[in-house]
Amino acid sequence: MKNIIYPTFIFLSLFTILLGDLASPTPFTVRQPNGMELNIFIRGNHLRNWYEYHGWAIVKNTADWWVYASGVDGQKLLASDQRVGIDPEPDHNLQLSGITGKLIPEALVLEDDAPIPDLYSTRDDTFRVPMILVEFPDYGATYETSKFDSLMNYEGYTHLNYSSTGSFRDFYKEISYGQFIADVDVSDWFMAEHNHDYYGYNNGYQRVKRLVRNMVDSLEAAGFDWSIYDNDGDGYVDALNLAHAGPGAEEGDETNIWSHKSSLGNLAVTYDGVTISSYNFNPEKQMGNFVCIGVLAHEFGHALGLPDLYDTDYSSTGAGKLALMASGSWGTTGTS
């Protein structure tokens, strides 16, 4: 593989990358305290996201009412006293007449100092990838390990009722013209130390990073050999994958973990002569079903240096549904 050129991977790695999954394109239902149901959207990604109703930014106030946003304060939207679905929408509401365009919060900054794999220097065409499955004391897994093994590795894998969708391995083999063969070793389900909501997106990322480190330590204690996952010989595990029980926060419930790629920072650890730092986290489920390869391939793409190609302010569709690093991460979920 040393003489093989990957022009797309090299070119895209020059861009500034956001490293997370785009929010679900499907609305979901919430209830106001009076019982009224609203169909709303979550927008953005793991660094900047907000909720919308009929295109207007909304927030939940301290009394659990969904209200229209009145402004932006850094990484937060400000709540008005105008209730969604009850009071007039901003373009017909004198109390919100100062809103002249989309209200979008500022983005978080999530540092990622892990090196990008050097695909010129990989040992051969096979790129070995570890995958850890994580469940919680109060939120167990639904699907067996064998289901993930098929999703990641089985040639000709079929997802739900779609024909010949292919596996994670099939996808990367096809787009590389047979020159990049992912070989994913899927673990058993490991139990997290804390309950599900402790690691939720609404509690920040440090708890998730600690969870990743704990899972790495658990595998090391079980005799795992990390050295075989340094494909380019730079002393780092190239792309640690994890999947957690349940759906991701990108579907609207921010007590879940938002799918993303990052690094462990000061929690990085060296086992078997290689350092484990780079990781990506994915959900077990999407839209109520078993997860599709889209989000897994998307986050893994970040580990290879690929940028997000969606538009985070929704002024355009970005690269669209057929691009893995745009809305393609939702392919075969029933949303597109």
Protein language model annotation of sequence segments:
Residues M1-L22:
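Bacterial Sec-dependent N-terminal signal peptides
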Residues P7, E111, N280-E284:
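General secondary-structure edge motif
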Residues T8, E37, N45-N49, D313, ...:
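A broad, structure-centric signal for solvent-exposed, well-ordered loop/edge residues
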Residues L19-S278:
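Zymogen propeptides/activation segments of proteases
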Residues A239-N241, A245-S336:
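Extracellular hydrolytic enzyme modules, especially secreted metalloproteases
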